[in-house]
């Protein structure tokens, strides 16, 4: 089932300059975020229940969250050479993050936006991975 949903949002190969490496990394990250037994800390993947308990406008919490997520993703995704994590939205019921990724063997950065939506993470940019 997850395989089908990923195929539905992946960019079309024809007429798109998206490399297989970029598509693979984005697909694997989305799978990692949505895995019920993810190796990422629960606040990072099951974000909303834990996020609502804290003050989402707390800049220290936001900074901590970004650092923890960056560290975990660099550990679990060896194809990432450099990573910057930014919170785009952080409200009680909304969490949107942007990952600025530099991959090994790729000269251009990759932007991958994720949004917590209805109990799971979805890509806000997977259709337009560049």
From Swiss-Prot:
Keywords: Cytoplasm, Stress response. It is found in: Cytoplasm. Transmembrane segments: none annotated. GO terms for biological process: cellular response to oxidative stress; DNA damage response. The keyword rRNA processing does not apply. GO terms for molecular function: anti-sigma factor antagonist activity. Its main location: cytoplasm. One of its GO terms (cellular component) is cytoplasm. InterPro entries: Anti-adapt_IraD, IraD/Gp25-like. The keyword Cytoplasm applies. Inhibits RpoS proteolysis by regulating RssB activity, thereby increasing the stability of the sigma stress factor RpoS during oxidative stress. Its effect on RpoS stability is due to its interaction with RssB, which probably blocks the interaction of RssB with RpoS, and the consequent delivery of the RssB-RpoS complex to the ClpXP protein degradation pathway. Belongs to the GpW/Gp25 family. IraD subfamily. Interacts with RssB. This is Anti-adapter protein IraD. It comes from Escherichia coli O139:H28 (strain E24377A / ETEC). The gene is iraD.
């Amino acid at each position: 089932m997850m395989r089908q949903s990923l195929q539905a949002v992946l960019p079309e190969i024809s007429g798109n300059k998206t490399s297989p490496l970029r598509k693979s990394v984005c697909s694997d990250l989305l799978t990692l975020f949505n895995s019920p037994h993810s190796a990422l800390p629960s606040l990072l993947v099951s974000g909303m229940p834990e996020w609502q308990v804290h003050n989402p406008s707390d800049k220290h919490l936001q900074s901590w969250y970004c650092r923890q997520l960056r560290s975990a993703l660099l550990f679990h995704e060896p194809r990432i050479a450099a990573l910057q994590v930014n919170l785009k939205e952080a409200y009680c019921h909304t969490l949107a993050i942007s990952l600025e990724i530099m991959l090994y063997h790729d000269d251009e950065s990759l932007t991958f936006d994720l949004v917590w939506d209805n109990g799971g993470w979805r890509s806000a940019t997977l259709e337009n991975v560049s």
